[in-house]
Design a protein with these regions (language model features):
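ATP-binding N-terminal substructure of ATP-dependent carboxylate-amine bond-forming enzymes
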Residues: 11-138, 142-143, 147-149, 153, ...
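ATP-dependent carboxylate activation and anion-phosphoryl transfer catalytic cores
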Residues: 13-16, 22-25, 162, 282-314
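Short hydrophobic/aromatic-enriched beta-strand-loop microsegments
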Residues: 136-140, 165, 250-251
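Active-site nucleotide/adenylate-binding loops and adjacent lid/helix of ATP-dependent enzymes
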Residues: 14-22, 26-27, 34, 102-106, ...
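Phosphate-binding site of ATP-dependent enzymes
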Residues: 208-293, 314
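Single conserved hydrophobic/aromatic residue that forms the stacking wall/gate
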Residues: 1-12
């Protein structure tokens, strides 16, 4: 693109340009839309120039000029002004390339906020593109995102610094099912079978006895080629937000997830049919402080930056 074409897209340089990325070629596409709509509504437009970049379920990138309501409803692609656009890996561009009726034009971005969930967005792929382009990333970077997305790798790292993890095994899609069942026999039922690199509890099954293991593993392999099988933890799930960027990370209040039955699957996580989130958690001050310190340790161990949420069991 020529310098003149690039100048076509220049806006008010007094306000930093923040690109909000949403959607994505992921099973968690719908959740990303809900999150992005909330983020967009809460960014101060008087301070920042918001550039919305939507990624379709099929992986097509667009510059979206419409309201947040259409993102939330899932109808954003039908908006009349939604041209194809993408983030250029070139540091010379340092932003997006947009295809318009007048040709292509470029617009510089000061920072990018990937509000993407799951594979192809939360796993380091988009973060790597942004880092290569020289665009600052709001949230965790490429390495941390990739580490946190893989349950096996994340658990191994936090275990190495003294954080307790439940006994587990890792199996691969080309493993013989008989060998998988035999390998899992050293664990105590009930077990949880989880795709190693899937979020929002998608593909997770709770298995009460050995007869149900093969079916659960086959189901998990539909979402990933790597599966974690772990012992269930009989405890209360707690968690807190951690915010970095300063010498000492800041933690939010500790919350507690109160479940009447079952586990926190996709429907419970986003529909809260029977789950109740209690803030603050019903715990002692000393235990709350221990949880916060453990959350900070995990945050540092997994190389997190910006904001993160750390969950654990008591």
């Amino acid at each position: 693109t020529s310098r003149r074409q690039r100048q076509m897209c220049i806006r008010d340089r007094n306000k930093p340009k923040i690109a909000v990325l949403f959607g994505g070629c992921s099973e968690e596409y719908d959740i990303s839309l809900q999150s992005a709509a909330s983020v967009i509504r809460n960014i101060d437009g008087n301070k920042y120039d918001i550039i919305n970049i939507g990624i379709s379920r099929h992986g097509v990138w667009h510059r979206y000029y419409g309201p947040a309501d259409l993102i939330e409803s899932g109808a954003w692609e039908s908006y009349y002004k939604c041209p194809v656009a993408f983030i250029s890996p070139s540091r010379d561009v340092h932003g997006i390339v947009e295809f318009t009726s007048m040709g292509t034009c470029c617009e510089r971005i000061d920072a990018a906020f990937p509000v993407l969930h799951g594979r192809n967005g939360e796993d380091g792929t988009v973060q790597g593109l942004l880092e290569m382009a020289g665009i600052p990333v709001i949230g965790c970077g490429m390495l941390s995102s990739a580490i946190c997305m893989d349950k096996d790798v994340a658990h191994s790292l936090v275990k190495s610094v003294g954080v307790s993890t439940t006994p587990s095994i890792v199996v691969r899609k080309n493993d013989d099912m008989h060998d998988i069942v035999l390998k899992a026999s050293k664990l105590i039922y009930p077990l949880f079978v989880k795709p190693a690199r899937s979020g929002s509890s998608i593909g997770i099954c709770k298995v009460e006895r050995e007869t149900g293991l093969a079916s659960a593993v086959s189901s998990a392999f539909e979402h990933d080629t790597k599966v974690v099988i772990e012992q269930a933890v009989n405890g209360v799930e707690v968690g807190c937000a951690v915010l970095g960027g300063c010498s000492e990370p800041i933690t939010g209040a500790v919350d507690e997830i109160d479940l009447i039955s079952g586990f926190l699957d996709y429907e419970e996580k986003y529909g809260a049919r029977t789950a109740t989130i209690r803030v603050p958690a019903r715990i002692s001050e000393s235990l709350e402080e221990r949880i916060k310190q453990t959350a900070k340790l995990i945050y540092r161990t997994l190389e997190c930056s910006g904001f993160a949420r750390v969950d654990m069991f008591l």
